[in-house]
Amino acid sequence: KAAEHGISIILDGVFNHCGADSKYFNKFSNYSEPGAVQQVGSAYDKWFTFHEDGTYESWWGVDALPTIVSDNPDYQEFICGENGVIRTWLRRGARGWRLDVADEISDSFIQKIRAAALAERSDAVIIGEVWEDASNKRAYGKLRQYLEGSELDGPMNYTLRKSILSFLMNEAGAESTALALEELWENYPHEAFYSCLNVFGTHDKERLINVVAGAPTPDSLSAHEQVTYRLSADQ
């Protein structure tokens, strides 16, 4: 239906970690099939890293988000195989994928994701969550290959967001802003430059109106308004 209205659906692929309550980890035994927590030798136990004290690797130490061993061959087949996650959802009508925390999945895995997507539909698009200049990004000591033709069509353009907002907030002048934008133009391949996901507000950043106009102080809001703006720790 979306395609009939000229709308393309880009799905958010989180392939570096999952929820502790997912069927794969099943920390709370909410699923009948044994997850990695319930049974050594389960279909998913090699997808995660457990320590002798019962703890496990998790995304930035958040135990609700166990880290997936994303270079595990079985996991990569689950994601990139003919009937894997990537191809199944493209087959159902999605147009592409946005890769969450691209810095934390390997170049080789991203290459497999892209290959799987293009095998399903030749016009599939792969966007990566990269917060800096994606042409020369170093992550965990390694120079990434995002824009060399076999991984991302383009990144989320947080670099553009930073430059524009710095100018609007009078934190940067016109000349330095122009130079920052020109640097992107020079660094990015032509195709990648025009395939960026340009954003000013996302679930990871402040709302644009709050940045430009200023967020209200908590004391200026009624209890009801506070709830609609930001929940307190107790709430």
Task: Cite the ranges covered by each PLM segment.
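A short, hydrophobic secondary-structure junction motif
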Residues: 44-47, 160-164, 235
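Conserved, charged catalytic cores of large soluble enzymes
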Residues: 212-219
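Substrate-binding/active-site clefts of carbohydrate-active enzymes
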Residues: 1-92, 113, 119-120, 136-137, ...
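Active-site-proximal helices and loops of the catalytic beta/alpha 8
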Residues: 3, 17, 26-33, 85, ...
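Residue-identity detector for glutamine
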Residues: 38-39, 76, 111, 145, ...
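Extended catalytic-interface subdomain
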Residues: 203-206
